[in-house]
Swiss-Prot record:
One GO term (biological process): L-proline biosynthetic process
InterPro entries reported for this sequence: Ald_DH/histidinol_DH, Ald_DH_C, Ald_DH_N, Aldehyde_DH_dom, G-glutamylP_reductase_CS, Glu-5-SA_DH, GPR_dom
Name of protein: Gamma-glutamyl phosphate reductase
SUPFAM superfamilies: ALDH-like
Keywords: Amino-acid biosynthesis, Cytoplasm, NADP, Oxidoreductase, Proline biosynthesis
Pfam families referenced in this protein's UniProt entry, alphabetically: Aldedh
GO MF term list: glutamate-5-semialdehyde dehydrogenase activity; NADP binding
Gene3D superfamilies cross-referenced by the UniProt entry: Aldehyde Dehydrogenase, Chain A, domain 1, Aldehyde Dehydrogenase, Chain A, domain 2
Species whose genome carries this gene: Shewanella piezotolerans (strain WP3 / JCM 13877)
Function statement: Catalyzes the NADPH-dependent reduction of L-glutamate 5-phosphate into L-glutamate 5-semialdehyde and phosphate. The product spontaneously undergoes cyclization to form 1-pyrroline-5-carboxylate.
PROSITE patterns per the UniProt record, alphabetical: PROA (PS01223)
Alphabetical list of PANTHER family matching this protein: DELTA-1-PYRROLINE-5-CARBOXYLATE SYNTHASE (PTHR11063:SF8), GLUTAMATE SEMIALDEHYDE DEHYDROGENASE (PTHR11063)
Pathway as given in its UniProt record: Amino-acid biosynthesis; L-proline biosynthesis; L-glutamate 5-semialdehyde from L-glutamate: step 2/2
Family: Belongs to the gamma-glutamyl phosphate reductase family.
């Protein structure tokens, strides 16, 4: 079977399965998700063993620590993934809800109702937790899904999908509601992007190269995002003692994810006192620094080395314990820097001045903008959405963390009384 024939078969099966999903009641979907959670718990040892194969292979292939951290699915992370299923079960199912309705002058009673998108294709890299997150959100909203994970997590993804598909069968549903492309041939990605006869939306979760490939080749609507060049501005009226803790959380807690902090902008009034204190604390956590000339000047007599920041470094999503630092003279300069280098993901300001905070929130055009909070909150779970499909940095059809509602569309329903148009 050729790749094209394989993909068409996959798409046809997914489309057929989506019709069965679309007719499920909320109770049936809840039973399915509970079954998946139970089976994942029972298969915990097998899943972790499969993931360990991926980790060992990644180490043998010389992959970076950041990449290995991304693909790791140990017991705490797996239990967190399973807990997220329970969170999704508790969320309101948007499918079938009425958005609005009205009686028209022509006699029609018109309403908009939320319905599943149909079939979703998700292309992602070294994160096996995405396999479960996506499948659960898709099933909750009545969508079939075609998954194409990275070759680095092939064993993990196969183990996870086997469990999910067994739950589908146990609940009397088509296993093809969730399908995995387990062939690492990259041409299959290009083929999936053109499977518009069957697939309704593509969600790429990966780096710039994957995002660019999807944007250039897809004949299907694509949700772009997941690249997080995130900024935090320490205003002249910030509480500097509290600011260090927020920045440490944003940078250090989990540096390999897209909502981790990349660049700190510091008002020049506080630079001489704040930057040395910040660098001293973060250095104890293994953070290295790129800084502007003013940053290097205020750190000249300190032991922490500050490498010269460049356009390239400011344009980098570090995904590691590396932080850019830039001194700015005003809120306007901070906003200008963010507008130039941000990926549109998450930005934050630390300030006790409510007017400055409001100006920042109005001026910065990113998916999530914070006042006195870490950028790490940009997450479906933290936003109360349950697990997320992705974090969209575009403005159509979804923006920011994509939860259940982002996996639906609507259709117009019109009731008449043998009504004709005049």
């Amino acid at each position: 079977m050729s790749n094209n024939e394989f993909l068409n078969k996959l798409g046809e099966q997914a489309k057929k399965a989506s019709y069965a999903l679309a007719s499920l009641t909320g109770q049936q979907k809840t039973a399915l998700l509970r079954c998946i959670a139970s089976k994942l718990t029972d298969a915990k040892a097998n899943i972790i063993a499969a993931n360990q194969q991926d980790v060992e292979q990644a180490k043998a292939n010389g992959l970076s620590e950041a990449m290995i951290d991304r693909l790791l699915l140990d017991e705490p992370r797996l239990l967190s993934v399973i807990a997220d299923i329970d969170n999704v079960i508790g969320l309101t199912d948007p499918v079938g809800s009425e958005i609005d309705s009205r009686l028209l002058d022509n006699g029609l009673r018109l309403s908009r109702r939320r319905v599943p998108l149909g079939v979703i294709g998700v292309i992602y890299e070294a994160r096996p937790n995405v396999t479960v997150d996506i499948a659960v959100l898709a099933l909750k909203t009545g969508n079939a899904v075609i998954l194409r994970g990275g070759k680095e997590t092939l064993a993990s993804n196969k183990a996870l999908c086997k469990v999910i598909r067994s739950a589908m069968a146990e609940q009397g549903l088509p296993e093809d509601c969730v399908q995995l492309i387990d062939n690492p041939d990259r041409s299959l990605v290009s083929g999936l992007l053109k499977l518009d006869k069957y697939v309704d939306m593509i969600v790429p979760r990966g780096g710039q190269n994957l995002q660019r490939l999807c944007a250039e080749q897809a004949t299907i609507p694509v949700i772009l995002g997941g690249i997080g060049i995130c900024h935090l501005f320490v205003d002249v009226q910030a509480d500097l003692d509290k600011a260090v803790a927020v920045i440490e959380n944003a940078k250090v807690q989990r540096p390999t994810v897209c909502n981790a902090l990349d660049t700190v902008l510091v008002h020049q009034t506080n630079a001489a006192s704040f930057i040395p204190a910040l660098c001293q604390q973060l250095a104890t956590k293994g953070v290295s620094f790129y800084g502007c000339a003013q940053t290097q000047a205020v750190m000249a007599n300190n032991e922490q080395q500050i490498m010269q920041a460049t356009d390239e470094s400011y344009s980098t999503e570090w995904l590691s314990l590396t932080l850019g630092i830039k001194v700015v003279g005003s809120l306007e300069e901070a906003v200008a820097h963010i507008r130039q280098y941000s990926s549109g993901h998450s930005e934050s300001i630390l300030t006790d001045n409510i007017h400055t905070a409001s100006e920042f929130m109005n001026a910065v055009d990113s998916a999530a903008v914070y006042v006195n909070a870490s950028t790490r909150f940009t997450d479906g779970g933290e936003f109360g959405l349950g697990a997320e499909v992705a974090v969209s940095t575009q403005k159509l059809h979804a923006r920011g963390p994509m939860g259940l509602e982002a996996l639906t569309t609507y259709k117009w329903l019109a009731w008449g009384d043998y009504t004709v148009r005049g």
